[in-house]
Amino acid sequence: MTLTKMLEELPRHCDICAKKSSKGHQQYWRGYKLHLDVADGQIPISAVLTSASVHDSQVAIPLATLTAQRVTSLYDVMDSAYDAQEILEHSRGLGHVPIVDPAHRGRKTKNVIVPGKQPRQLTWAEEKRFQERTMIERVNGRLKDEFGGRFVRVRGAVKVMAHLMFGVLVLTVDQRMRLSE
C-alpha cells in the first residue's frame, strides 16, 4: 500500500477520546491528535494529524514510512503501544532495528506451577537506546507548554494542522539553536 493511501485512510474528523491516567482517573479530550517522529536532538522529522480517538499504533506504519523517505535512520524506538508484529516487521522492512518496550497485556502476573513462555524483555543495549525515547515526551511537552499546542482555538483539521505546524517549526528552530551553542 502506498503512503498516500495509508494517510488517506486515517480519520481526520474532530471527535472525543478518553484514556485512563497513571493515577487511574479518566481523562477526556475533544479534537485531534498530533503524532510526531523525532530524531536525536529533539528535532521533529514527521508529523501526522488524526482524530483524537485514533490509537498511536494505527499511525506507526505511515509515520515510519514518511520518515524513512526523509532521513536515514537506524533505529525505531517506540513505547509499548507499538508492540505489534506488523509494526515490528515493517520497521525491519525499512532496514531499521525496532526497539519497542514489551507490552504487558493482562497486567497481573499469574502464579503457575509449570512456567510457560517467558515474556520478551529488552537487552541491556536496547534498554540503553530505549532511554532516548523520553526525548519525544520532552518534545510533546514543549510543544504544548511553550509553543501553543495545548489550546488550539480554530476549527477544522487543516487549520489545526497549520497552527500546530507553526509550533513545530518554532520548536525545531529553537532546538537547532540550542544544539549549535
Regions found by a protein language model. Name each.
Residues 54, 130, 156:
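Charge-dense, low-complexity intrinsically disordered segments
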Residues 59, 135, 139, 162-165, ...:
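Catalytic-loop motifs flanking and including active-site residues across diverse enzymes
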Residues 1-93:
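Polybasic low-complexity intrinsically disordered regions
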Residues 151-181:
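Charge-patterned, long linear interaction tracts outside catalytic cores
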Residues 80-148, 153:
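Helix-centered, glycine/charged polyanion-binding patches within enzymatic domains
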Residues 51, 105-106, 158:
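Residue-level detector of flexible, active-site-proximal loop/helix-junction positions
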